[in-house]
Curated annotation (Swiss-Prot):
It holds the Pfam family PhosphMutase. Disulfide bonds: none annotated. Catalyzes the interconversion of 2-phosphoglycerate and 3-phosphoglycerate. It comes from Pyrobaculum arsenaticum (strain DSM 13514 / JCM 11321 / PZ6). The keyword Metal-binding does not apply. Its EC number is 5.4.2.12. SUPFAM superfamilies: Alkaline phosphatase-like. Belongs to the BPG-independent phosphoglycerate mutase family. A-PGAM subfamily. CDD domains: iPGM_like. Keywords: Glycolysis, Isomerase. InterPro entries: Alkaline_phosphatase_core_sf, ApgAM_prokaryotes, Metalloenzyme, Pglycerate_mutase_ApgM, Pglycerate_mutase_ApgM_sf. It catalyses: (2R)-2-phosphoglycerate = (2R)-3-phosphoglycerate. This is 2,3-bisphosphoglycerate-independent phosphoglycerate mutase.
Length: 411
């Protein structure tokens, strides 16, 4: 029985620059061969004009209405970082950042690359601060670094996810104070804890040896932790029960691993797939093809297209696409006997450096899929294809139908 390899370029969608997008400019003969022999269209990850987060977009793509199931990004980050969540826990996505003496954000990612020894130093400092603040307020504090500047913070106790972000979401703005979003003791306490953790980290970070070294190297110091997306663990029917599909996900980013785990996918990692713009995809693609014999759908997440977009790096984004395509090439014959989906979870145009709400290209190859006249995978071409305009939440039902796994609606 055939299965599906689903390749997702995070933030892969873009807007034309000089008449081309990164997908259009990239030399990707394997993906374009599948495109020329498949059906294409455009996809609204959530709905037309809605600017998706990566969390809400992946919920929709995996077949779950984010307006119903989304409970905040933090819980998915924690799941993906192998932090076990208990009922009542509140989790936040964190960014290591750089602020000036007035608390104004200079870089929301502290230069993005955080060396392992730097991440360990931050974890050690946060453990010390967390224990002290936790004793003061009667809560447990857990912090864990994940990839690059990213991390997760979990609060356990009489806490609430109903607090505002401290991340201002832009450079040049002052790091915000967490404020309760409801009139409850739990929300007020949570805001106090978050603000004290943030303040004490910034005060203590100045003395970290890693920051002395970073300054000598001409790099930005790590002197702030920005929190956003406070949330709790949602109750979600597993994908096997909801859609009769055995699914696996291969991802290097905690958020995507977490969303996949939340919907009941088996989650894998691969050598070279760290969730960065420098990822090497050979082992990840090899693993994906091997897993296709055990699963109905194998999802492969490519983070580098989003990271390069946020950095405004057109050529870097093209390079990520081309490296993935090159890793696919040795397996083309095997893929031709199965189904292949290529799409994005949202557009992150290089010229905007942020998520935007336009549709992204989508391609479905399969032995029995209608072949349209689109020959190149790109925003400039896929809109002409046979798939038309679909939503993210439509992908899994479409795949279930081709695989013969979906139930008939009515008689």
């Amino acid at each position: 029985m055939p299965s599906v390899l689903w390749i997702l370029f995070d933030g892969g969608g873009d807007r034309p620059a000089g008449g081309k997008t990164p997908f259009h400019a990239a030399f990707k003969p394997t993906i374009d061969y599948l495109t020329a022999n498949g059906s294409c269209g455009i996809l609204d990850p959530i709905a037309p004009g809605v600017r998706p987060g990566s969390d809400t977009a992946h919920l929709a793509l995996f077949g779950y209405d984010p307006f119903k199931y989304y409970t905040g990004r933090g819980a998915f980050e924690a799941l993906g970082a192998d932090v076990a969540l208990k009922p009542g826990d509140v989790a936040f996505r964190t960014n290591l950042a750089t602020v000036d003496e007035n608390g104004v954000v200079i870089d929301r990612r502290a230069g993005r690359y955080i060396a392992p020894e730097e991440a360990k130093a931050v974890e050690d400092l946060m453990k010390k601060i967390g224990e002290e603040v936790g004793r003061k307020y009667g809560v447990e504090v857990v912090y864990k670094s994940t990839v690059e500047h990213r991390g997760v913070l979990v609060l356990r106790g009489a806490v609430s996810h109903r607090v505002s972000d401290t991340d201002p979401h832009k450079v040049g703005a002052k790091m915000a104070r967490a404020e309760p979003l409801e009139n409850s003791k739990e929300a007020a306490l949570t805001a106090e804890v978050v603000n004290e953790l943030s303040r004490r980290f910034t005060e203590a970070a100045a003395g970290l040896e890693i920051n002395k070294a970073r300054r000598l190297q001409g790099r930005l110091p790590i002197n702030a932790i920005l929190l956003r997306g406070g949330g709790y663990m949602p109750q979600i029917e597993p994908i096997r029960e909801r859609y009769n599909i055995r699914a696996a996900a291969i991802a290097g980013v905690a958020l995507i691993r977490g969303v996949a785990r939340a919907v009941g996918m088996d989650v894998y990692t691969a050598k070279g797939l760290g969730g960065t713009k420098d990822d090497v995809f050979d082992e990840a693609v090899k693993l994906a093809v091997e897993l296709m014999s055990r699963y109905d759908v194998v999802f492969l997440h490519v983070k580098g297209t989003d990271s390069t977009s946020h950095d405004g790096d057109f050529n870097g984004k093209v390079s990520v696409i081309e490296r993935l395509d090159k890793a696919l090439a040795p397996y083309l014959d095997a893929l031709l006997k199965n189904y292949v989906v290529v799409t994005s979870d949202h557009a992150t145009p290089v010229g905007v450096r942020e998520h935007t709400g336009e549709p992204v290209p989508v391609m479905l190859y399969g032995p029995d899929v209608v072949v349209d006249d689109v020959a190149k995978f790109s925003e400039l071409t896929c809109w002409r294809g046979a798939l038309g305009r679909i939503r993210g939440i439509d992908i899994i039902p479409i795949l279930g139908s081709y695989l013969g796994l979906s139930e008939k609606f009515g008689e």
